[in-house]
Amino acid sequence: MPNKLSHYDRAGRARMVDVSGKSAAKREAEASGFVAISAAVLGALPSNPKGDPLEVARVAGIMAAKRTWELIPMCHPLPLSLVDVEVRVCENGLAITSKVATTAETGVEMEALTAVSVAALTIYDMLKAADKGIEIREIVLERKSGGKSGDYRRRK
């Protein structure tokens, strides 16, 4: 493995990374995912009796990003300055994107990925009665900037 796994000590025990020696810096991350849904359910989205599932999913993603540190054991609580989640209808389902920013000692990749993941799970929850074949696919980090490891952009 080219890089040391930073969340383990020398004895192999899980640990939270000490970021106290790092300087706060502007950090951003973007993630995306896709929820495959039948055409019939896509066509019925506006009339869902539970409310607008796209808006509920968007808000759920924002809320989840802010609570990532409570969901993923070794994540730090971060002062997020931006969480933007978009859900848009595509030909075969719903495309979800997130953008998260902070000025802190560690990055926001996990927050961006959590936002997309929970938005996708919320869509599944709201539509599962109408379509048992819903598939959550391709949740990926698209881009990150800031920090010691430098910038990253996913190759497509």
Kindly give the residue locations of the regions a language model identified.
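C-terminal binding/interaction regions
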Residues: 1-76, 81-156
